[in-house]
Amino acid sequence: LQVALDHSDLQGAIKAAVSVGQEVDIIEAGTVCLLQVGSELAEVLRSLFPDKIIVADTKCADAGGTVAKNNAVRGADWMTCICCATIPTMEAALKAIKTERGERGEIQIELYGDWTFEQAQLWLDAGISQAIYHQSRDALLAGETWGEKDLNKVKKLIDMGFRVSVTGGLDVDTLKLFEGVDVFTFIAGRGITEAADPAGAARAFKDEIKRIWG
């Protein structure tokens, strides 16, 4: 279970992190907050949670090596690149994050908009084996939900050799849609952080994950 700190301010993000950090496996410095406050967010999260995996959700499109180094030196283990970034950008990001974080360092590819399985094979060939499948916030607001076409794409990526995380409008009740699919990580943001009891919401997510996947 990964919590996404989808906040616009540092105080809100840190307050949410403290409320649920011990209940989740991975803590994500969200894109909007990183744009507001920079990689300082990763540094604060690392100081609060020295043993957790910290993700910088930069959605990096260019300058991969520089962006990855800047976040990794602040404590990020994983960083995201957008799927339309060039292979050299992704490779530079991977090299930089591994230089700082060792084997713990990884790049995740964010699947937004148009992408192909042919491109995905190039990411694997470049040494990147994590992908994040989205239902975007805007798509969800437009009324789209998780369907068979999404699940089939997730399954194909897994069959190719990716560890696939899923995100977008997830709650405890939607987890069962993925039964039988070897999802790597479920990423939830406001579904956890804006709950009346965030820690309880995180525990409910984890209980349902354990119930379905054991």
Tell me what each language-model feature is:
Residues 93, 147, 179-181, 191-214:
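C-terminal helical cap(s) of enzyme catalytic domains, especially alpha/beta-barrels
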Residues 63-161:
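Conserved anion-binding
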Residues 7-11, 31-36, 60-63, 85-88, ...:
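Short, small-residue-enriched loops and turns at beta-alpha junctions
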Residues 1-5, 27-29, 54-58, 79-81, ...:
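Hydrophobic faces of well-ordered beta-strands that scaffold small-molecule active sites
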